[in-house]
Amino acid sequence: LMPKEYRTIEEAADYEDLYAHIVKKFQETFFDAEGNMTAQTQTAHIVALYFGLTPEVYREKTVKRLTELLEKENGHLVTGFVGTPYFCHALSQNGRVKEAYDLLLKEDFPSWLYQVKQGATTIWEHWDGLKPDGTMWSADMNSFNHYAYGAIGEWMYRVMGGIEADESTRSEERRVG
């Protein structure tokens, strides 16, 4: 979460202190004394895991609970714009690669492949933007090219494809091949 370069050493120290304070407050607010998250949603667990906000001693417990919440929904995500982009990352970064693939490959509603089965060539704003009978979810707020759910593409090229940016050099110095 922390930038790699700063203009001054003092600025770096300030940001490191701020980060430590944010993590501490997050943990005090969203974890109880037994290591359970106070918000029992998929998104809360995803955010805590993906952004490194989970106390290390409770990491496995948090991952286990996230998989339980996923199982409770028959392997479906019930997340929105905050949790969806990081769901498969949170799973795969914590040893649950199979669950991440299973989530990606679900074909029934709500899922990415549900949209594909409905004829989608882009990622929709709503999982059921177009229903099986051809009617629209709603004429309002029904984009058929939407970012949040489309963020699965990043997980696909980084994790499935193994393509990562080389942050150690400037872009014009990088070569593929």
Where do the protein language model's features map onto the residues?
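Active-site core of glycosidic bond-cleaving carbohydrate-active enzymes
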Residues: 1-175
